[in-house]
């Protein structure tokens, strides 16, 4: 229940839109049947000559079918499902706004249905304005409820339209220009623009402001007793914080699972050693007179943008930029306070050659802040199986492989995990010592590859059932946080077939799993970060 109420995932919201549209369609169909029964023959048929009731049915049928069936299903349902997939986006541009857009619709439908129980109902048709909505035609509050219903559904559609427009304009895959967009995305995009231009008629006038003012007055009077507000005390939004626990985080994801500083510090150190740089300038100013600043940069794959936001939020500092000529984002921390926070997080948790760059960074920070008194805590000597350093290192450079060779007479299936590191020397050290330590932990070997090229590398590969189980057991204890977690889950499914000895019987299923792994993945689910 909590998941469906608070979910910001586009597929979840799309599912809710479709369920809501089906429910509204049944109500609208009932109205449609009544209208057709009444019009099936000349004269009075089933409504006993009650023309106001007929007008109410006509009005309700129009509102329900358009605002609660067609638009939620066609735009909200199929749009949320297909638009992110078709443009290569992980989600909508504003996931929390997506949640609000949907949950404005149920109260809107309730208000419309409630209008039928006040007086004789709102029988104005589309002209919900005077004289039909005046006191002579409708002396009660039925039209007010219908108008408020239109305001809510209108603002819901406006928020959704803004979300779709922003998503299509800003979250397309690199290289997907507007003329390459699928026609369905164009249809949603143009529809959203038309909605944004037309719906202020229903949702953006002065009347909604009055309605909201009245609503807030009622809200205050109802909840004042609950929160024990005295007569002379002003009721503010802070008074209701006990009702809603608002998790104000930068990405549209929960970060409670990474809030442990011990876990996050080791994970972050592994992430930096795997695909990060620590830059400390030798001179305060360049030859051209420009000031040089130290910085720490962490590289994330394009599809790991939510993880990049989470790391930025947990550090509390940093800027995210697109890496030029590469499908990646860079998180850069270059302000003094941010570097101090980062240094405290990873101090004593670095295992490889980047430790010497970290020492230079600490010296620079102590020089800039004499009262800091930050001291390097040395290399991380904790056994690999007892902290999350390796998890961050794998997040940066690990890959889960499923290989299939089915064209020959004897088909072959293999499962492996790989870690590759450059042999570049840092301060007289290479990554071989670290790679060898990981290999011993996983009970495998390290090989040197591309030795004849300019960029020789060390490669660690697990290929036996035992070594694959070792890496699985570790990552269950210290889970990955990015999209590699999705590859790991699929990889574990294939590993279970190998454990049971049924991998040859499930060849088709393994090929299907392989088709969605690594760079071929088209569907991303961030539920593991909820």
Curated annotation (Swiss-Prot):
Q: Which family does it belong to?
A: In the C-terminal section; belongs to the LAGLIDADG endonuclease family.
* Superkingdom of this protein's organism: Eukaryota
Residue ranges, annotated region (COX1 exons 1 to 4 encoded):
1-204
**InterPro entries, from UniProt?**
Cyt_c_oxase-like_su1_dom (IPR023616), Cyt_c_oxase-like_su1_sf (IPR036927), Cyt_C_Oxase_1 (IPR000883), Homing_endonucl (IPR027434), LAGLIDADG_dom (IPR004860)
For membrane topology, the record states: Multi-pass membrane protein
Q: Sorted alphabetically, which PROSITE patterns does this protein's record hold?
A: COX1
Enzyme class, broadest EC rank: hydrolase
One Pfam family it belongs to: COX1
Extract the PANTHER family matched here.
Answer: CYTOCHROME C OXIDASE SUBUNIT 1 (PTHR10422:SF18)
GO cellular component assignments: mitochondrion; respiratory chain complex IV
**PTM comment, free text:** The mature protein may arise from proteolytic cleavage of an in-frame translation of COX1 exons 1 to 4 plus intron 4, containing the aI4 open reading frame.
The molecular function GO annotations come to:
cytochrome-c oxidase activity; endonuclease activity; heme binding
Transmembrane spans: 15-35, 56-76, 99-119, 145-165, 183-203
This entry's Enzyme Commission designation comes to: 3.1.-.-
GO BP: aerobic respiration; intron homing; respiratory electron transport chain
Query: Where would you find this protein in the cell?
Result: Mitochondrion; Membrane
Q: What does this protein do?
A: Mitochondrial DNA endonuclease involved in intron homing.
For this UniProt record, give its keywords in alphabetical order, as a comma-separated list. Endonuclease, Hydrolase, Intron homing, Membrane, Mitochondrion, Nuclease, Transmembrane, Transmembrane helix
Q: What is this protein called?
A: Probable intron-encoded endonuclease aI4
From the UniProt entry, list the residue stretches annotated as the region COX1 intron 4 encoded. 205-530
Q: Which organism is it from?
A: Mycosarcoma maydis
Major location (coarse): mitochondrion
């Amino acid at each position: 229940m909590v998941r469906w109420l608070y979910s910001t995932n586009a597929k979840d919201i799309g599912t809710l839109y479709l369920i809501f549209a089906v429910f509204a369609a049944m109500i609208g169909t009932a109205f449609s049947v009544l209208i057709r029964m009444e019009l099936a023959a000349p004269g009075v048929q089933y409504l006993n000559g009650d023309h106001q009731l007929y007008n109410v049915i006509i009005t309700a049928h129009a509102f329900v079918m358009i605002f609660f069936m067609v638009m939620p299903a066609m735009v909200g349902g199929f749009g949320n499902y297909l638009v992110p997939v078709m443009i290569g986006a992980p989600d909508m541009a504003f996931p929390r706004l997506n949640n609000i857009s949907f949950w404005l619709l149920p109260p809107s439908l309730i208000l419309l249905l409630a209008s039928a129980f006040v007086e004789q109902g709102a029988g104005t048709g589309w002209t919900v304005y005077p004289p039909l909505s005046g006191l002579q035609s409708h002396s009660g509050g039925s039209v007010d409820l219908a108008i408020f219903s239109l305001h809510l559904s209108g603002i819901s559609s406006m928020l959704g339209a803004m979300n779709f427009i922003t998503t299509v304009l800003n979250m397309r895959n690199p290289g997907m220009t507007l003329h390459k967009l699928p026609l369905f995305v164009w249809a949603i995009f143009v529809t959203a623009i038309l909605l944004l231009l037309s719906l202020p008629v229903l949702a953006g006038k002065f009347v909604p402001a009055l309605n909201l003012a009245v609503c807030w007055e009622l809200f205050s009077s109802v909840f004042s007793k609950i929160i024990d507000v005295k007569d002379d005390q002003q009721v503010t939004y802070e008074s209701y914080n006990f009702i809603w626990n608002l998790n104000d985080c930068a990405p549209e994801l929960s970060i409670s699972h990474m809030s442990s500083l011990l876990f996050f510090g080791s994970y972050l150190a592994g992430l930096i050693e795997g695909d990060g740089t620590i830059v400390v300038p030798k001179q305060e100013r360049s030859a051209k007179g420009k000031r040089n600043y130290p910085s720490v940069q962490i590289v994330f794959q394009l599809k790991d943008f939510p993880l990049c936001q989470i790391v930025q939020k947990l550090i509390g500092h940093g800027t995210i930029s697109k890496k030029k000529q590469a499908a990646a984002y860079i998180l850069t921390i270059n302000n003094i306070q941010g570097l101090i926070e980062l240094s405290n997080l990873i101090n004593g948790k670095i295992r490889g050659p980047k430790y010497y760059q970290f020492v230079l960074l600490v010296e620079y920070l102590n020089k800039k802040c004499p009262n800091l008194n930050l001291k390097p805590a040395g290399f991380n000597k904790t056994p690999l199986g007892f902290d999350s350093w390796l998890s961050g290192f794998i997040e940066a450079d690990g890959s889960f492989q499923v290989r299939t060779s089915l064209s020959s007479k004897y088909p072959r299936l293999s499962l492996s995990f790989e870690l590759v590191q450059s042999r570049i020397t840092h301060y007289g050290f290479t990554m071989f010592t670290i790679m060898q330590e990981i290999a011993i932990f996983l009970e495998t070997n390290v090989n040197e590859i591309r030795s004849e090229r300019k960029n020789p590398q060390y490669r660690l590969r697990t290929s036996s059932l035992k070594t694959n189980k070792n890496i699985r057991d570790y990552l269950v204890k210290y889970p990955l946080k990015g999209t590699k977690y999705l590859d790991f889950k699929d990889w574990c499914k294939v590993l279970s077939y190998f454990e049971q000895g049924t991998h040859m019987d499930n060849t088709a299923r393994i090929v299907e799993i392989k088709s969605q792994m690594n760079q071929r993945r088209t569907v991303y689910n961030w539920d593991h970060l909820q």
